[in-house]
């Protein structure tokens, strides 16, 4: 899979938002937290992740390209808040009261835990499986475990083993 190329103007807009919110937080918290490293290598359906020990933010390049302004407005401060909470409070719940306070009171933004971006372009391939009562979709990882004989999955509703293939109504 080839990496997405982020236009320079978009990278600059991301950095501007990051620096604005970091400066705002440093003023309100009376601290001088350093600028985190920023990387565009988040994969899957997550818009971004905050890496606490390495003080870095990883952003999903596909979702950034598809949702530019909303991504910059919401995801960049969201991940920055995780880093700031870790520095300010230590180890706490990821979206707990400290994170909510950081988002709302310090950064002045709504504390939303998840994004609402369309994820069809970043969703992993799934494989059809069936049981006695319905159709199921297994992730690539789970499908490969079945193929290698490492795992067997059962339907939570009827309890029968899942088998590859489409469900046929009788």
From Swiss-Prot:
It is found in: Cytoplasm. One of its GO terms (biological process) is response to stress. Its main location: cytoplasm. Belongs to the SprT family. Residues 19-163 form the SprT-like domain. This is Protein SprT. It holds the Pfam family Zn_ribbon_SprT. Zn(2+) binds at residues 78, 82. It comes from Erwinia tasmaniensis (strain DSM 17950 / CFBP 7177 / CIP 109463 / NCPPB 4357 / Et1/99). One of its GO terms (molecular function) is zinc ion binding. Keywords: Cytoplasm, Metal-binding, Zinc.
């Amino acid at each position: 899979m080839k990496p997405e190329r982020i236009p320079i103007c978009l990278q600059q807009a991301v950095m501007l938002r990051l620096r604005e919110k970091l400066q705002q937080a440093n003023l309100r918290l009376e601290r001088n937290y350093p600028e985190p490293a920023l990387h565009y290598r988040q994969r899957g359906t997550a818009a971004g992740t905050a890496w606490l020990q390495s003080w870095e933010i990883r952003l999903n390049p596909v979702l950034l390209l598809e949702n530019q302004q909303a991504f910059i407005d919401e995801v960049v401060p969201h991940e920055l808040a995780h880093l700031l909470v870790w520095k300010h409070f230590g180890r706490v719940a990821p979206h707990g009261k400290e994170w909510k306070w950081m988002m709302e009171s310090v950064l002045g933004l709504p504390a939303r835990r998840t994004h609402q971006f369309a994820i069809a372009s970043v969703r992993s391939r799934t494989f059809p499986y069936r049981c006695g009562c319905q159709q199921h979709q297994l992730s690539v990882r789970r499908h490969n475990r079945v193929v290698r004989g490492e795992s067997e999955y059962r339907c939570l509703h009827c309890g029968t083993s899942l088998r590859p293939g489409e469900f046929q109504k009788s």
